[in-house]
């Protein structure tokens, strides 16, 4: 499953992390692997440093369908303020771009 999602062993790791009460961080994995984690996990996940792919199409950012899955999972996505992950074409990060990211992310608020 290299670059294509979780292997069977990867699914077992997620299940073991759930049993141990560990958070599963979906940052730095492919979108397919994110989807697999969200399918397998029994606990909320975290994306400790990720941004919206729709705003800045970087491979480490999270596509909208996964943002929706994280919301359903009651997980947390924390914005990565590295400019290449927030602003298209790696221009220097400015307050307006960060505000755009924040406003976009408000589409996916906590379920409560």
Where are the predicted features?
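Extended, charged catalytic domains and RNA/DNA-binding interfaces, predominantly
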Residues: 1-91, 95-112
């Amino acid at each position: 499953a290299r670059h294509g999602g979780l292997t069977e062993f990867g699914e077992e790791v997620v299940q073991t992390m759930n049993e141990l009460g560990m958070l599963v961080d979906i940052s730095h994995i492919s979108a397919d692997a994110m989807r697999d984690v969200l399918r397998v996990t029994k606990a909320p996940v975290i994306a400790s440093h990720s941004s919206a792919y729709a705003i800045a199409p970087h491979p480490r950012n999270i596509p909208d369908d996964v943002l929706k899955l994280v919301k359903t999972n009651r997980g947390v996505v924390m914005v990565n303020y590295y400019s290449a992950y927030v602003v298209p074409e790696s221009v220097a990060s400015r307050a307006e771009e960060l505000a755009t990211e924040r406003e976009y992310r408000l589409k996916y608020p906590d379920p409560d």
